C-alpha cells in the first residue's frame, strides 16, 4: 500500500523544501495557512506565527499558493507515463484542490 500512496511524501517534501505557503482545509471546514515545516506518517507541522501539529486524518485538502515542481517514482499506478522505461516523473502541481491520503513514512525536516 505504501507504493500506491507514494504521491503524498514527494508532494509534502516539495512544499517543505520550496517553503511554499499552503492553505490546509480540515474535514470540519477550518482553513489553516502556513508553510510545511515537517511531516511524518501521521501528522504535518505547519508553521505560521506559531508551529501547529495537524494530524493527517483531520486534513481534507492542501492547496499550495503557487505551482510546485514534484518528482516521484514511476511505479505509481495512478500516473500515466508515455515512457514506461523512465525511472522518475516530474510534474508541476498547481494550486488546484489536491486531496491527500494517509501514508507510511518517516519524519521529514
UniProtKB/Swiss-Prot annotation:
HAMAP family assigned to the protein according to its UniProt record, in alphabetical order: Hfq
Secretion signal span: none
InterPro entries given in the database record: Hfq (IPR005001), LSM_dom_sf (IPR010920), Sm (IPR047575)
This protein's UniProt keywords: RNA-binding, Stress response
Sm domain ranges (all copies): 9-68
Matching SUPFAM superfamilies: Sm-like ribonucleoproteins (SSF50182)
Family in the record: Belongs to the Hfq family.
Pfam family, one: Hfq
CDD domains found in the cross-reference section: Hfq
RNA-binding recorded as keyword: yes
Organism encoding this protein: Francisella tularensis subsp. holarctica (strain LVS)
Start and end residues of each stretch annotated as Disordered: 77-109
One GO CC annotation: cytosol
Gene name in the database record: hfq
The protein's name in its UniProt record: RNA-binding protein Hfq
Domain of life of the native organism: Bacteria
Gene Ontology molecular function: RNA binding
